Amino acid sequence: MASDVKTDRRYTKDHEWAKVEGDKVVVGISAFAVNQLGDITLVNIDVKPGDTLTAGKAFGTIESVKTLSDLFAPVSGKIERVNSDLNDKPELVNDDCYGAWMIELTPSDKSEIDGLLDSAAYAELLKTAAH
């Protein structure tokens, strides 16, 4: 499972990832989350460009054949883009969870990124989650 952890991004304990791209942060869910969820049937993003999001608050839901889960913002900021491709093709998350981003935002406090788990810490978290 640790091999499914990308080193170019940070993670939350709820299994969202945050990748810094210039002055923006792109957000999605990890391979561990996808494996736990199973086949994704619906991605519902409740925010739109221009909205302000607070770290730890839900920005949408993801539904699979097994369950419905909230999607949480890893950092606070202003929504710049939403991946509308996921409306019609939620299976993109199963196919490539690190390519199928969900939201892009401009962080209001870049230090929040440093508070997220780096890839090594996230891999350690997954070891305990697997037991």
Q: Where are the regions a protein language model picked out?
A:
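Acidic, low-complexity mobile loops and tails
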Residues: 1-58, 96-131
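Small beta-strand-rich domains/subdomains or short beta-sheet motifs embedded
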Residues: 10, 52, 63, 68-73, ...
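A short, compositionally biased micro-patch
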Residues: 20, 64-65, 74, 108
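Structural motif
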Residues: 24, 76-78
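Aromatic- and Lys/Arg-enriched surface recognition patch
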Residues: 80-104
